[in-house]
């Protein structure tokens, strides 16, 4: 059985983004050019006339090897381009934060021999000067170099107590003593007038009653009503009985009998009854 040895690949070191690394870029460029030269030599060897016994398979192998070298050369040149010609980030403004220049204090001017009242320095410049002073005078702890051991001159400038452990990150808190306090400027008369006008406008706006927005009435939603109940039709006999009962209720009461009074009643008696009564009496 044939034993296949694994292919040994050289590790490629790629620099971090945003940093220049000319050595790595030069290495990628040389590797790319070497691969291109090898590919060209192989291609020229293929084009030269050889023995007639050369098979098609061997020809294909040679062409594949040339293509592989060309691809490797392309990869190396792309890496070189990404490292060498990466676009840089540029900031538009340098007048913010640590880079904004301010007037230094009198204590800082005497400490650094700068002219007081005219020189303006940023926090970055002052920090750089103090770090150089600490390094030159060997004011760092031997075991931990992040700890600063300030001398009397530096203590007076930063106004640090003996109990405080001063470090490079915490030093920024004490740099406020190296600059003059920013005094608020008095407002000009024009600005005062503008402010007065604004206040008058604000008061009038506050006094004016706010318009109450009419709220829209909610739309009346038609509630579905149940269908009317069908009246049950009574049979004919019940209808007749109900009609008779209604008629009885509507009938007038019978007339009262008249009281009999003397002659008038006799006059109204028929003659036949009078004759019969007369015969009976006889």
UniProtKB/Swiss-Prot annotation:
Residues 97-181 form the SWIB/MDM2 domain. Residues 262-275 have a biased composition (Basic and acidic residues). SMART domains: SWIB. Residues 1-21, 199-282 are annotated as: Disordered. Disulfide bonds: none annotated. InterPro entries: SWIB_domain, SWIB_MDM2_dom_sf, SWIB_MDM2_domain. Pfam families: SWIB. Residues 1-16 have a biased composition (Low complexity). It comes from the Viruses. SUPFAM superfamilies: SWIB/MDM2 domain. Belongs to the IIV-6 306R family. This is Putative SWIB domain-containing protein 070L. It comes from Invertebrate iridescent virus 3.
